[in-house]
Amino acid sequence: DRMKDYCSQADEVWHAGDVGDVSILDLLPKGKMLRGVYGNIDDAAVKEILPEGLEFEVEGVKILMTHIGGKPPRYAKGVKERIKSSKAQVFVCGHSHICKVELDRELHCLYMNPGAVGQQGFHPIRTLLLFDLSEGKVTNLRVVELGKRGAIGA
C-alpha cells in the first residue's frame, strides 16, 4: 500500500490519533520512530501504548501533538495555552480527518492536521503530510493524496 511506502521513506512516523485497532500500529514499518497520540475512537489497548498528548523537539523544532485540537483561531479548550506555554513551533492534531495546514501568525506556530489515511470517517480523500525538519525549520512540506475514502486498492 502507498501509505506504507511513504512511511518507509520517513525517518519518523507521527500519528495524530484515531488509530482504531491497535494492530494497525504493527503495519507501520519496523525500526521507525513512532510518535503518536490516542484519539477519541481509540480503546484501552491503544491508550496503553500512546499518550493523550506529546511535546517533543526534532532538529531544533518544538512540536506539540494532541488529537482534538480545533483549528486557528478556534482551538479546543486549553490548546492555545499549551501552544504558548510549550513554545511549540508546530502543532499537530487530528480529529476532523480533514487535511489542513495553516500558519497561526498570532501564536507563531504552524498548525498541521494531516487528514486521515484510513477508510473510516468523513474525509472524502485519504491524505498524509510529508516534510523535512532541519535547523529549526519545517521545509519541503507536501500533501500526499492516497485516493478516495472507501476506494479499493487505494
Task: State each model region's role.
Residues H15, E57-V58, L103, L133:
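Generic beta-strand structural signal
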Residues V13, D18, L28, G39, ...:
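Divalent metal-coordination and catalytic microenvironments
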Residues L141-G153:
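Short, solvent-exposed aromatic-acidic interface loops
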Residues D1-L34, D42-E52, G60, P124-T127, ...:
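N-terminal active-site segment of His-dependent metallophosphoesterases
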Residues N40, G69-K71, V117, S134, ...:
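Short, solvent-exposed coil/turn elements at secondary-structure transition points
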Residues R35, P73-K137, L141:
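Conserved beta-sheet core of the metallophosphoesterase superfamily
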